């Protein structure tokens, strides 16, 4: 009988979480949702010195922002130590593990001898019990590590959903340390016990874990467990072709939020960073879940492309509700010194957002563009000298007069602009540029008629007339 699908995301809280990390949450989340299964969050925090609550919080915050909800967890490995110790005791009792007293110095010396002889460096089984074998006398006062009694013959085989059939000879594997001298279990051991206890059916993770897989399968089988389906995802590369990492300049997941990216854009981009559905580039979260499968996971490293993410973000910004974007823009406006009081004195923020969003790739850019509506203009003196010339002043005066009398609609403002151009035999930039400078303080705005309508008649006319006084 087919087991109900259960997937997991099992990060180590030892640093910030970047897009390459969170992709290993997105795919198992999507697969669990597609298969009506269960998605488990497990925090692998056995590296006590490097783990931190701050890193855990960053993981949870990033998952929440991207909408990667989990059904069980977070489950912390440090809270399962009693269970690990019980399994270690069981393995010792059943002869599946044994104490090893070889010191680190002895092991280093052994490996040096093996290298000198052209052999693969590995533990040689000195303390491994065998029928008829006489073991050395345990040294006084030395606490042993525990090693897993790996099979000496045969082959570990699994059909990886990404890499295809993988075969590793047990002769290549030495007896893995599964507990330290102080009794604390090792990562590879904890992972096996967790996956077994949590009935994980599919392990979707980075291919930096491939070398761990045959050892984990052997331990799992020794404990009577059924190996899950493995899907080892190729590395995510940065734009320079290096493995994505903090050291190589990767941004944290939340840095994308703080830069003005929308979560749906990041999810869409991440989904395509190692998986495909035909030629589809833009799709909703619901479509992604419906389409996701393991068969179309990429087999080659995926390279991050910031311009592609920005393009997707621009698409989702255009599609987003103005009120939602306005709320998201508020922190960016605050950072620009534009508070609620300033916004209250200007045009409706939703309307400003609606005008500015078609030109923006991030919410931050929307806020930067919207700021002109809530500030007293301070145009550059050189720009004023260039655009507000004696030749154009009569046209500006006529335009101000026309705008005083016009209906305050985009169409009426546009008609006033065109009539002024015709009267003074000017081209649009000759009039629009000085008007932009005087009203908005910049020559870079959306369509001039739409901008003037939002500024309002009083602000537009008074600012033009003040410059002509």
Swiss-Prot record:
Motif, 'KMSKS' region: chain positions: 243-247
Main subcellular localisation: cytoplasm
Subunit structure: Monomer.
The protein's enzyme class: ligase
Name used for this protein in its record: Glutamate--tRNA ligase
Keyword Protein biosynthesis recorded: yes
Function comment: Catalyzes the attachment of glutamate to tRNA(Glu) in a two-step reaction: glutamate is first activated by ATP to form Glu-AMP and then transferred to the acceptor end of tRNA(Glu).
